[in-house]
């Protein structure tokens, strides 16, 4: 079951983001010092700010527990940015990420978007393959001097 997040649930959502992004941070050697903007280290104030500015946030539940989270941010008339797609390690490989992704495409399309963009750690080949297998197209890369990895940019059409 996927549904919109309420403000009171943001601390629970942050725990999901921290745990899910934490496995990737560990794998790629990310720390609060070398990558403070990574979801593994995000403060509640940032998530609350995004919520209050109107970003759409959703959770995927199994029973009473939150298994996954995602955030959609409008970036233009026809474009949304998919952010913080996160599935707790114990719920991975059960289709929750794919369900959240499909829901994101439908939600963005219902709000007039034609495309969804995402930025990932380019060196995370497993994640990149997953997005490509789920309809995304690799659009290029960029090196940012403040990040210890290359950012890969992907995009997909909404609604499908």
Where does each model-flagged region fall?
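Acetyl-CoA-dependent GNAT
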Residues: 4-89, 98-103, 107, 140-146, ...
């Amino acid at each position: 079951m996927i549904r919109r997040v309420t403000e009171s649930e943001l601390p629970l959502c942050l725990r999901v983001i921290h745990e899910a992004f934490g496995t990737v941070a560990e794998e790629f050697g990310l720390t609060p010092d070398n990558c403070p903007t990574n979801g593994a280290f995000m403060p509640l104030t940032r998530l609350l700010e995004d919520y209050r500015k109107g970003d759409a946030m959703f959770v995927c539940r199994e029973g009473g527990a939150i298994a996954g989270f995602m955030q959609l941010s409008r970036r233009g008339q026809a474009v949304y940015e998919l952010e913080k797609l996160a599935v707790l390690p114990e719920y991975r490989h059960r289709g929750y990420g794919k369900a959240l992704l499909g829901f994101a495409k439908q939600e963005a399309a219902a709000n007039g978007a034609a495309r969804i963009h995402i930025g990932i750690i380019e060196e995370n080949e497993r994640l990149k393959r997953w997005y490509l297998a789920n309809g995304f197209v690799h659009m290029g890369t960029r090196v940012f001097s403040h990040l210890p990895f290359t950012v890969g940019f992907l995009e997909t059409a909404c609604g499908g």
